Design a protein with these regions (language model features):
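Charge-lined substrate channels and their catalytic hotspots, especially those that engage the 3′ end
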Residues: 1-232, 239-285, 323, 619-620, ...
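A short macromolecule-binding patch
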Residues: 29-34, 109-115, 597-614, 665
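Electropositive polyanion-binding surfaces
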Residues: 130, 135-137, 163-166, 170, ...
Length: 673
């Protein structure tokens, strides 16, 4: 337990209202920083904090802590700013006569940035810009900066992606040294390399990906022999071309992962590699790292071999085509791929076995709608729920099997390695989830200090097909901790497995590339004591960096998706949609539409009654008419307005009579404990 005299180092997370939080590595909760104790800290600063004792806390928060509603020692004061986290800020410029302000895109930054006229760099009002901070402000003065890049008009959809990329400091263009390094990369496989590898070109080999995918980094072989399924997962040997500490390798580490931003991809590796020599294109000899598994009729992986190999893909398949065969039995598709139909049927058979094996041990399979966003000529033309077909699951099952097999192999060899780990959820969050889902008649078992993933699996099974399936699945997912990379093999809670790593996507993930390098050195007998010491020294930092870069990419993907949804709904203001209440707080109601777009209904716009938020029922309840809006309720809403600056969509609820509530007057909000 941390004492109030102990100083801790962490990252400051600001809030528009002036207060903030500090996240400290190794502590599973954030420290609340009152507005009068931030010491001028700016969002993302590295700070030194001192936990407060009860006597230093504001009365209401002190009482809440005594009652157990907040964690002990969860409040602190900033004692020192160690390092400024943000050097630049992205936002929209508003020009006055002799100066201007930039309204930050990041809603956590609690003040606009003052721009002296001489530093506007040709920006016009309404331009989205990048500002270099020259002063971080204080209690009386705003932060100050100078404009170093004009991205474009904030209403232009083409500026959306670039603004998010600049805000999160995601590398966009490849530096010159990387371009120069590409000159050594061949267009075809060197025939001399083939002699040293296991030749698998005679096996019928397929890739299965989305229609638009170009970076094909995994291929599958499968056949039966001596009562065993012979499953081969073949992964592009990226490490053969991206050598350690080369410019390509350093830039790949810097990026950490490819970033998929709706209709644009920011790749981890240049196209010459990702779409060229490393992509497992049909009819081309390709260097691979293969995990060859023998699976019995009960779905047990009884033996395996990991080897450097060469393959030649027979057919580049799509999820749509494979599903048309194994699910729809579409005559035309089956005729076209008649020679491969038995292979796909066998794949489905083995996939079902592997999936059932995971289900028996308690692996959690979340099934909620993801968004499919179609962009045509720079504008969003369609948003809807992404249809997940059985063929997606086939590839997922095979990749999981390879990842687990590789991780277990290297764990028992006691070699330095990068694992993918997922810790059990926090007991308090599990308790809160249990209370929430009980309102919908669902329950799951959890002891005070322990919960098994199988209980979550049972919950997901119990809500399958129900109207609240999508919503409860999301609530359950939010209860989980984030998976991360680690040198310690501590298991994966969500998959209910002891050993796990990321092996199958080295074109788009650096951790996969990292362990390919280790595996190949081990296969070749070059992983001697010195090399093991080398990896033991560098892997902890690389794991931490990979985890941070993954979170950065996920943030970018979320932000761009928000922007595209706002852009799309701005064309539908005034239109009526069906939705489900996905969240409630004292400010209003969140509603998710059938097309996966989420918007907000402010309690101030609910004129038919005086509404109070009930914490006990997670509902907004009318005081006079007894109207009640709870999570999971179906509602009809009208799109009231959208705002690209705040990335927000506002709805108003249509009343039961088919009319939206009207009228004016003072709205009263209250808490019902």
């Amino acid at each position: 337990m941390k004492t109030a005299d102990e100083l801790l180092e962490g990252t400051f997370i600001s809030n528009k209202k002036g207060f903030g939080f500090v996240r400290v590595d190794g502590i599973d909760y954030d420290f609340f920083i009152p507005a009068n104790k931030t010491r001028g800290a700016f969002h993302d600063d590295k700070v030194l904090i001192r936990p407060l004792d009860e006597s230093e806390m504001y009365g209401e928060r002190r009482n809440r802590r005594r009652s157990g509603t907040v964690k002990k020692l969860s409040e602190a004061s900033v004692e020192k700013i160690l390092e400024r986290g943000l050097k630049t800020v992205v936002g929209v410029y508003q020009k006055n006569k002799k100066f201007g302000f930039v309204i930050p895109d990041n809603s956590r930054i609690d003040s606009d940035i003052f721009i002296p006229g001489r530093f506007e760099n040709g920006a016009k009002s309404g331009d989205r810009v990048v500002v270099e901070l020259t002063s971080y402000g204080d209690k009386v003065r705003s932060a100050e900066g100078k404009i170093i890049e004009v991205i474009g008009d904030y209403t232009d959809p083409l500026t959306d992606v670039l603004s998010v990329v600049r805000e999160l400091k995601i590398p966009y263009e490849f530096p010159e040294e990387v371009t120069a390094d590409l000159k050594r990369i061949p267009d075809e496989v060197d025939p001399r390399e083939l002699a040293t590898r296991t030749d698998l070109r005679d096996l019928v080999t397929v890739t299965i990906d989305g229609e638009d995918a170009k970076d094909l980094d995994d291929a599958i072989t499968l056949y039966e022999e001596n009562g065993m399924y012979k499953l081969g997962v073949h992964i592009a040997d990226v490490s053969h071309y991206v050598t350690e500490n080369s410019p390509l390798d350093k830039e790949a580490l810097n990026r950490g992962t490819s970033c998929y931003l709706v209709d644009k991809v920011i790749p981890m590796l240049p196209e010459k590699l990702s779409n060229g020599i490393c992509s497992l294109n049909a009819g081309k000899d390709r260097l691979t790292l293969s995990c060859l598994m023998d699976i019995d009729k009960n779905g047990n992986i009884v033996s395996h071999k990991i080897c450097e190999s060469v393959i030649n893909v027979n057919e580049r398949m799509t999820y749509t085509a494979v599903s048309a065969i194994v699910e729809d039995r579409d005559p035309e598709t089956m005729e076209r791929y008649s020679e491969l139909v038995p292979l796909f049927d066998l794949m489905l058979e083995v996939s079902d076995l592997l999936r059932e094996k995971r289900r028996q041990r308690g692996s959690i399979d979340f099934d909620f709608d993801e968004s499919k966003i179609v962009v045509e000529d720079g504008k969003v033309s369609y948003i809807g729920a992404y249809e997940r077909r059985r063929s997606n699951g086939i590839i997922e099952d095979f990749m999981l099997a390879a990842n687990e097999t590789i991780a277990e192999d290297y764990f028992w060899q006691e070699l330095p390695f990068e694992y993918r780990v997922h810790e059990a959820p926090d007991a308090e969050k599990v308790k809160q989830l249990g209370v929430l889902i009980s309102k919908f008649g669902f329950y799951f078992k959890a002891s005070r200090d322990n919960v098994h993933p199988k209980e979550f699996q049972k919950l997901i099974d119990s809500i399958s097909g129900s109207e609240c399936e999508n919503m409860v699945s999301r609530m359950t997912l939010r209860t989980m901790k984030q998976a991360k990379y680690s040198t310690e093999c501590t298991g994966h809670f969500g998959l209910a497995c002891r050993y796990y790593c990321h092996f199958t996507s080295p074109i788009r993930r650096y951790p996969d590339l990292m362990i390919h390098r280790i595996i190949k050195e081990n296969i070749r007998g070059k992983l001697n004591d010195n090399r093991q010491k080398h990896y033991n020294a560098i892997l902890p930092k690389i794991c931490d960096d990979n985890s941070k870069k993954e979170r950065r990419a996920e943030s970018a993907e979320r932000e761009v998706e928000k922007l595209k949804k706002v852009e799309y709904m701005s064309e539908h203001v005034g239109e009526v949609f069906q939705g489900v209440i996905s969240g409630v707080n004292n400010r209003g109601i969140f509603v998710e539409l059938e097309n996966t777009v989420e918007g907000f209904v402010s309690v101030a716009d609910m004129y038919d009654d005086f509404y109070c938020y009930s914490e006990e029922e997670y509902a907004m309840i009318g005081e006079t008419g007894h109207n009640k809006y709870s999570i999971g309720d179906k509602v009809t809403v009208k799109v009231a307005k959208t705002d690209k600056l705040t990335k927000s969509i506002d709805f108003v609820i249509k009343m039961k009579e088919g009319e939206e509530s009207h009228g004016k007057g003072k709205r009263r909000q209250a808490h019902r404990k």
